[in-house]
Protein backbone atom coordinates (compact mmCIF):
# COMPACT_ATOMS: atom_id res chain seq x y z
CA UNK A 1 0.00 0.00 0.00
CA UNK A 2 1.23 3.48 -0.87
CA UNK A 3 1.07 6.33 1.63
CA UNK A 4 1.35 10.12 1.53
CA UNK A 5 1.48 12.98 4.01
CA UNK A 6 -1.71 15.01 4.38
CA UNK A 7 -2.02 17.77 6.99
CA UNK A 8 1.03 16.43 8.80
CA UNK A 9 -0.22 12.83 9.02
CA UNK A 10 0.74 9.84 6.91
CA UNK A 11 -2.40 8.34 5.35
CA UNK A 12 -3.15 5.71 2.66
CA UNK A 13 -2.77 7.05 -0.87
CA UNK A 14 -6.28 6.28 -2.06
CA UNK A 15 -9.72 7.88 -2.23
CA UNK A 16 -11.42 4.54 -1.64
CA UNK A 17 -12.19 2.67 1.60
CA UNK A 18 -9.22 0.59 2.77
CA UNK A 19 -8.87 -1.36 6.01
CA UNK A 20 -5.22 -2.18 6.79
CA UNK A 21 -3.99 -3.72 10.03
CA UNK A 22 -0.42 -2.82 10.93
CA UNK A 23 1.88 -4.02 13.68
CA UNK A 24 3.52 -1.50 16.03
CA UNK A 25 6.86 -2.12 14.31
CA UNK A 26 5.30 -1.43 10.91
CA UNK A 27 3.84 1.80 12.25
CA UNK A 28 7.19 2.93 13.64
CA UNK A 29 8.91 2.12 10.36
CA UNK A 30 6.40 4.14 8.32
CA UNK A 31 6.72 7.13 10.64
CA UNK A 32 10.51 7.01 10.57
CA UNK A 33 10.82 6.63 6.80
CA UNK A 34 8.23 9.30 5.99
CA UNK A 35 9.20 11.89 8.57
CA UNK A 36 5.51 12.40 9.39
CA UNK A 37 4.40 13.35 12.88
CA UNK A 38 1.46 10.95 12.89
CA UNK A 39 0.06 7.93 11.10
CA UNK A 40 -3.67 7.58 10.47
CA UNK A 41 -5.54 4.61 9.01
CA UNK A 42 -8.81 2.69 9.37
CA UNK A 43 -8.59 -0.94 10.54
CA UNK A 44 -11.54 -3.30 9.98
CA UNK A 45 -14.09 -4.15 12.65
CA UNK A 46 -16.29 -7.27 12.99
CA UNK A 47 -19.22 -7.36 10.53
CA UNK A 48 -22.33 -5.67 11.87
CA UNK A 49 -20.40 -3.53 14.36
CA UNK A 50 -21.33 0.15 14.45
CA UNK A 51 -18.60 2.63 15.37
CA UNK A 52 -18.20 6.42 15.53
CA UNK A 53 -16.08 6.29 12.36
CA UNK A 54 -17.03 5.24 8.85
CA UNK A 55 -16.72 5.64 5.11
CA UNK A 56 -19.64 7.11 3.17
CA UNK A 57 -20.57 4.71 0.34
CA UNK A 58 -23.43 4.07 -2.07
CA UNK A 59 -23.67 0.56 -3.59
CA UNK A 60 -27.23 0.99 -4.94
CA UNK A 61 -29.23 3.87 -6.38
CA UNK A 62 -32.79 4.19 -7.61
CA UNK A 63 -34.62 7.49 -7.98
CA UNK A 64 -37.88 5.91 -6.83
CA UNK A 65 -36.27 4.92 -3.52
CA UNK A 66 -35.72 8.56 -2.56
CA UNK A 67 -38.10 10.34 -0.22
CA UNK A 68 -40.90 12.36 -1.79
CA UNK A 69 -39.14 15.59 -0.81
CA UNK A 70 -35.86 14.48 -2.37
CA UNK A 71 -37.58 13.39 -5.58
CA UNK A 72 -39.21 16.82 -5.87
CA UNK A 73 -35.88 18.57 -5.34
CA UNK A 74 -34.18 16.38 -7.93
CA UNK A 75 -36.97 17.14 -10.40
CA UNK A 76 -36.49 20.86 -9.81
CA UNK A 77 -32.79 20.47 -10.47
CA UNK A 78 -33.41 18.47 -13.61
CA UNK A 79 -35.79 21.12 -14.95
CA UNK A 80 -33.48 24.06 -14.23
CA UNK A 81 -30.06 22.56 -14.90
CA UNK A 82 -28.20 20.69 -17.61
CA UNK A 83 -25.71 18.10 -16.36
CA UNK A 84 -22.95 17.11 -18.78
CA UNK A 85 -19.55 15.48 -18.97
CA UNK A 86 -16.82 18.08 -19.37
CA UNK A 87 -13.56 17.90 -21.24
CA UNK A 88 -10.61 18.77 -18.98
CA UNK A 89 -9.90 21.90 -21.00
CA UNK A 90 -13.49 23.09 -20.59
CA UNK A 91 -13.30 22.82 -16.81
CA UNK A 92 -9.85 24.40 -16.80
CA UNK A 93 -11.19 27.43 -18.67
CA UNK A 94 -14.59 27.80 -16.98
CA UNK A 95 -14.32 26.22 -13.55
CA UNK A 96 -12.27 28.76 -11.61
CA UNK A 97 -15.12 31.27 -11.28
CA UNK A 98 -17.30 28.56 -9.75
CA UNK A 99 -14.51 27.46 -7.40
CA UNK A 100 -13.82 31.03 -6.35
CA UNK A 101 -17.47 31.74 -5.55
CA UNK A 102 -17.81 28.52 -3.55
CA UNK A 103 -14.67 29.08 -1.50
CA UNK A 104 -15.43 32.73 -0.79
CA UNK A 105 -18.90 31.71 0.40
CA UNK A 106 -17.40 29.32 2.97
CA UNK A 107 -14.52 31.58 3.95
CA UNK A 108 -11.85 29.41 2.35
CA UNK A 109 -8.73 30.45 0.47
CA UNK A 110 -8.87 30.77 -3.31
CA UNK A 111 -6.03 29.47 -5.51
CA UNK A 112 -4.69 31.51 -8.40
CA UNK A 113 -6.62 30.94 -11.61
CA UNK A 114 -3.57 29.66 -13.46
CA UNK A 115 -2.80 27.25 -10.62
CA UNK A 116 -6.33 25.86 -10.88
CA UNK A 117 -6.00 25.45 -14.64
CA UNK A 118 -2.70 23.60 -14.35
CA UNK A 119 -4.12 21.23 -11.73
CA UNK A 120 -7.15 20.38 -13.88
CA UNK A 121 -5.06 19.86 -17.01
CA UNK A 122 -2.73 17.59 -15.04
CA UNK A 123 -5.76 15.40 -14.24
CA UNK A 124 -6.84 15.25 -17.86
CA UNK A 125 -6.49 11.50 -18.31
CA UNK A 126 -8.33 8.57 -16.72
CA UNK A 127 -9.06 7.69 -13.97
CA UNK A 128 -10.36 11.27 -13.62
CA UNK A 129 -13.80 12.31 -14.87
CA UNK A 130 -15.16 15.85 -14.99
CA UNK A 131 -18.85 16.73 -14.75
CA UNK A 132 -20.52 20.11 -14.94
CA UNK A 133 -23.91 21.67 -14.28
CA UNK A 134 -25.00 24.54 -16.48
CA UNK A 135 -27.72 26.96 -15.46
CA UNK A 136 -28.73 29.18 -18.35
CA UNK A 137 -25.52 28.19 -20.11
CA UNK A 138 -23.29 29.22 -17.19
CA UNK A 139 -21.22 26.64 -15.31
CA UNK A 140 -22.83 26.74 -11.87
CA UNK A 141 -21.34 23.57 -10.38
CA UNK A 142 -18.82 20.88 -11.18
CA UNK A 143 -17.59 17.56 -9.85
CA UNK A 144 -14.44 15.52 -10.23
CA UNK A 145 -14.67 11.74 -9.93
CA UNK A 146 -12.00 9.05 -9.85
CA UNK A 147 -13.01 5.76 -11.47
CA UNK A 148 -11.27 2.45 -10.80
CA UNK A 149 -12.98 -0.65 -12.13
CA UNK A 150 -16.17 -1.29 -10.18
CA UNK A 151 -15.79 1.69 -7.85
CA UNK A 152 -15.88 5.46 -8.16
CA UNK A 153 -14.91 8.19 -5.71
CA UNK A 154 -16.55 11.60 -5.63
CA UNK A 155 -13.39 13.64 -5.11
CA UNK A 156 -14.56 17.24 -5.60
CA UNK A 157 -17.94 18.98 -5.80
CA UNK A 158 -18.14 22.77 -6.00
CA UNK A 159 -21.25 24.92 -6.37
CA UNK A 160 -21.52 28.63 -7.10
CA UNK A 161 -23.90 29.92 -4.36
CA UNK A 162 -25.53 32.21 -6.92
CA UNK A 163 -27.19 29.11 -8.37
CA UNK A 164 -28.38 27.40 -5.19
CA UNK A 165 -32.01 28.10 -6.13
CA UNK A 166 -31.58 25.98 -9.27
CA UNK A 167 -30.82 22.86 -7.16
CA UNK A 168 -27.61 22.00 -9.05
CA UNK A 169 -26.33 19.62 -6.37
CA UNK A 170 -29.50 17.53 -6.62
CA UNK A 171 -29.34 17.36 -10.41
CA UNK A 172 -25.64 16.53 -10.36
CA UNK A 173 -25.79 13.79 -7.72
CA UNK A 174 -28.78 12.19 -9.43
CA UNK A 175 -26.88 12.13 -12.74
CA UNK A 176 -23.67 10.77 -11.19
CA UNK A 177 -25.45 8.04 -9.25
CA UNK A 178 -27.61 7.07 -12.21
CA UNK A 179 -24.56 6.85 -14.50
CA UNK A 180 -22.09 5.12 -12.20
CA UNK A 181 -24.16 3.19 -9.66
CA UNK A 182 -27.54 2.40 -11.22
CA UNK A 183 -26.30 1.72 -14.76
CA UNK A 184 -22.57 1.22 -14.26
CA UNK A 185 -22.82 -1.15 -11.28
CA UNK A 186 -20.12 0.72 -9.38
CA UNK A 187 -19.95 1.57 -5.69
CA UNK A 188 -19.57 5.31 -5.11
CA UNK A 189 -17.70 6.65 -2.09
CA UNK A 190 -17.02 10.07 -0.63
CA UNK A 191 -14.24 9.28 1.78
CA UNK A 192 -14.31 8.88 5.53
CA UNK A 193 -16.33 10.76 8.09
CA UNK A 194 -15.34 14.42 8.15
CA UNK A 195 -13.62 15.40 11.39
CA UNK A 196 -11.64 18.51 10.47
CA UNK A 197 -14.45 20.96 9.76
CA UNK A 198 -18.17 21.44 10.04
CA UNK A 199 -20.01 20.19 7.00
CA UNK A 200 -23.46 18.89 6.14
CA UNK A 201 -22.51 17.52 2.73
CA UNK A 202 -22.23 13.93 3.91
CA UNK A 203 -25.63 14.26 5.57
CA UNK A 204 -26.88 15.40 2.17
CA UNK A 205 -25.40 12.27 0.58
CA UNK A 206 -27.17 10.03 3.10
CA UNK A 207 -30.47 11.35 1.74
CA UNK A 208 -29.41 10.00 -1.68
CA UNK A 209 -29.05 6.49 -0.31
CA UNK A 210 -25.42 6.58 0.76
CA UNK A 211 -24.68 4.46 3.79
CA UNK A 212 -22.01 4.17 6.46
CA UNK A 213 -19.33 1.51 6.12
CA UNK A 214 -18.06 1.27 9.68
CA UNK A 215 -14.44 0.85 10.71
CA UNK A 216 -12.01 1.67 13.48
CA UNK A 217 -9.68 4.65 13.52
CA UNK A 218 -6.02 4.19 14.39
CA UNK A 219 -3.59 7.00 15.19
CA UNK A 220 0.10 6.42 15.85
CA UNK A 221 2.47 9.24 16.74
CA UNK A 222 6.13 10.08 17.03
CA UNK A 223 7.25 9.83 20.68
CA UNK A 224 7.17 13.58 21.27
CA UNK A 225 3.72 14.07 19.75
CA UNK A 226 2.41 11.02 21.62
CA UNK A 227 3.54 12.63 24.87
CA UNK A 228 1.81 15.89 23.95
CA UNK A 229 -1.44 14.13 23.00
CA UNK A 230 -1.51 12.19 26.28
CA UNK A 231 -0.91 15.40 28.19
CA UNK A 232 -3.56 17.49 26.42
CA UNK A 233 -6.22 14.80 26.10
CA UNK A 234 -7.76 15.27 29.59
CA UNK A 235 -8.05 19.01 28.85
CA UNK A 236 -9.42 18.69 25.31
CA UNK A 237 -12.66 20.46 26.26
CA UNK A 238 -10.70 23.68 26.74
CA UNK A 239 -9.60 23.81 23.09
CA UNK A 240 -12.04 26.44 21.94
CA UNK A 241 -11.83 29.26 19.46
CA UNK A 242 -11.18 29.39 15.74
CA UNK A 243 -7.42 29.32 16.13
CA UNK A 244 -7.51 25.95 17.90
CA UNK A 245 -9.52 24.09 15.27
CA UNK A 246 -6.68 21.73 14.36
CA UNK A 247 -6.12 20.87 18.00
CA UNK A 248 -9.82 20.10 18.48
CA UNK A 249 -9.80 17.94 15.37
CA UNK A 250 -6.82 15.95 16.63
CA UNK A 251 -8.37 15.43 20.06
CA UNK A 252 -11.67 14.38 18.48
CA UNK A 253 -9.87 11.81 16.33
CA UNK A 254 -7.93 10.60 19.36
CA UNK A 255 -11.21 10.12 21.20
CA UNK A 256 -12.58 8.02 18.33
CA UNK A 257 -9.35 6.03 18.08
CA UNK A 258 -9.45 5.19 21.78
CA UNK A 259 -13.10 4.12 21.62
CA UNK A 260 -12.54 1.80 18.64
CA UNK A 261 -9.20 0.32 19.77
CA UNK A 262 -10.84 -2.71 21.48
CA UNK A 263 -12.59 -3.68 18.23
CA UNK A 264 -9.52 -4.74 16.25
CA UNK A 265 -6.10 -6.26 16.81
CA UNK A 266 -2.84 -5.28 15.09
CA UNK A 267 -0.75 -7.63 13.01
CA UNK A 268 1.77 -9.68 14.95
Label every model-predicted segment:
Residues 22, 66-68, 171, 196:
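Residue-level recognition of alpha-helix initiation/capping sites
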Amino acid sequence: MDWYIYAGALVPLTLFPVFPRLSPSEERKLLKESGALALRYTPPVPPGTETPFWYVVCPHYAFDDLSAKMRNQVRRGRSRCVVERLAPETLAEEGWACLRAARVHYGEGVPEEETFRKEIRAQGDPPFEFWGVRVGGVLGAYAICVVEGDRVALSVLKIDPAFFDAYPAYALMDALLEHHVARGGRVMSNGARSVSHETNFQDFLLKFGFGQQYCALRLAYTPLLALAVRGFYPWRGLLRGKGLARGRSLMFQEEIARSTAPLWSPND
